[in-house]
């Protein structure tokens, strides 16, 4: 299916958000995720079903100063 990840088109076979993160090489519990502008908490990622055309945002913390 085709989805968008951080604004870029992506073809994926992942059906759940947690599987997409694995496919893209994201590891750890420090990520923030949203699908179609709705935050998806860590504990819900393995149950969150992706659909054609979804807009996924994956955010990682940044150090600032």
What is the meaning of each model-derived region?
Residues 1-64:
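Ubiquitin-like/PB1-type beta-grasp interaction modules and other compact soluble beta-rich domains
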């Amino acid at each position: 299916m085709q989805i968008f990840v951080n604004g870029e088109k992506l073809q994926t076979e992942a059906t759940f958000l947690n599987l997409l993160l694995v496919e893209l090489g994201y590891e750890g519990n420090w990520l923030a995720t949203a699908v179609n502008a709705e935050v998806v908490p860590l504990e819900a990622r393995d149950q969150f079903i992706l659909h054609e055309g979804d807009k996924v945002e994956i955010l990682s913390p940044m150090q600032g100063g």
